[in-house]
Structures are given as structure tokens and as C-alpha cells.
């Protein structure tokens, strides 16, 4: 049986600044939530963001990680889940976050009911990122209501 699936992809602007991280993070989160609302209103079945959507770039220092990284689960995944539930939309949100007590480049998978149903941890980290982040150990696929 065929089924039409509406997919939205969103890439945030790339920004680099070591002195304006608070502002950049706030602006990126605003763009994330605004873009999701638009995708939801357009009937998107799944919306996918580009890598490290919550920052796009962060100067790699332990101080920055401790101060600016989000936790998974946490306030951002809760808000993403609320939007997913409101529009009955799956969301794949790549975030640089602390999950399970470890700094990871993770893609969070949220289903239509707003629940976090999976996480993929980036396996092959760039050298600079590998100094701080823990790589994933396997390539994963996830089942969604319309396919894998």
C-alpha cells in the first residue's frame, strides 16, 4: 500500500562567534521552534534538522560545554515533544548535548506523540570534537509509523 509522506528539512544559518554564544543559542532555538511550527502547519510527517541544530558551531572548550550544552532528555526535548504532539509530526533533531552523563553529538528521534523514541550517537567524530565528545558505537536505524 502506497502512502504519501511529507518530509521537511531545515538547515539553520551557520554562525561562528566565541563571544556571543548565549545570543546565538537563543536565536537558533527560536528558529528551530518557529520552523517546526511552520512545518507542522504544512502537514509534515517528519521534520529533520541539520547537524548540531542547537548551536551550529560552538568553540570547543570544556567551559562552553558545561555552560551551554543541553541535556537529553531535558527542556529542549520536552518542547520539541510538545510541538511534535501538537502537529502529530515526527522530529529528528541533531543536538550537541549531554546524554547519559556524556557529551555527545546525538540525533534525537521524537515520535508523533511527543515521546523521545531513540537517539543516534555520531560514530565518526572530527578530531577536535573527539577531544570532548564520546562517539557512538553503532550505526542505527529507527522505525517510524510510515517506515524505517
Regions found by a protein language model. Give the residues of each.
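Active-site beta-strand/loop signature of hydrolases that rely on acidic residues for catalysis
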Residues: 7, 36-64, 84, 91-92
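Residue-level recognition of beta-strand->loop/alpha-helix junctions
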Residues: 11-13, 50, 121
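A short, hydrophobic beta-strand-centered structural micro-motif
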Residues: 73-98
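Active-site catalytic loop in hydrolytic enzyme cores
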Residues: 98-148
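Acidic/histidine-rich helix-loop elements
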Residues: 13-26
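Extreme N-terminal starter segment of soluble prokaryotic enzymes
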Residues: 2-9
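Short catalytic helix/loop segments, enriched in acidic residues and glycine
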Residues: 25-35
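Surface-exposed, active-site-proximal loop segments in enzymatic domains
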Residues: 17-20, 57-68, 107-109
Amino acid at each position: 500500500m502506497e502512502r504519501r509522506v511529507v518530509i521537511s528539512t531545515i538547515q539553520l544559518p551557520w554562525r561562528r562567534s566565541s563571544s556571543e554564544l548565549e545570543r546565538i543559542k537563543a536565536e537558533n532555538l527560536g528558529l528551530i521552534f518557529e520552523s517546526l511550527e511552520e512545518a507542522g502547519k504544512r502537514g509534515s510527517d517528519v521534520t529533520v534538522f541539520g547537524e548540531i541544530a542547537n548551536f551550529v558551531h560552538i568553540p570547543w572548550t570544556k567551559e562552553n560545554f558545561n555552560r551551554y550544552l543541553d541535556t537529553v532528555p531535558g527542556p529542549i526535548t520536552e518542547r520539541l515533544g510538545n510541538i511534535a504532539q501538537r502537529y502529530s509530526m515526527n522530529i529528528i533533531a541533531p543536538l550537541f548535548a549531554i546524554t547519559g552523563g556524556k557529551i555527545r553529538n546525538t540525533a534525537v528521534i521524537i515520535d508523533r506523540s511527543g515521546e523521545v523514541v531513540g537517539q543516534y550517537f555520531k560514530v565518526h567524530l572530527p578530531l577536535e570534537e573527539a577531544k570532548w565528545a564520546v562517539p557512538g558505537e553503532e550505526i542505527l536505524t529507527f522505525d517510524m509509523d510510515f517506515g524505517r
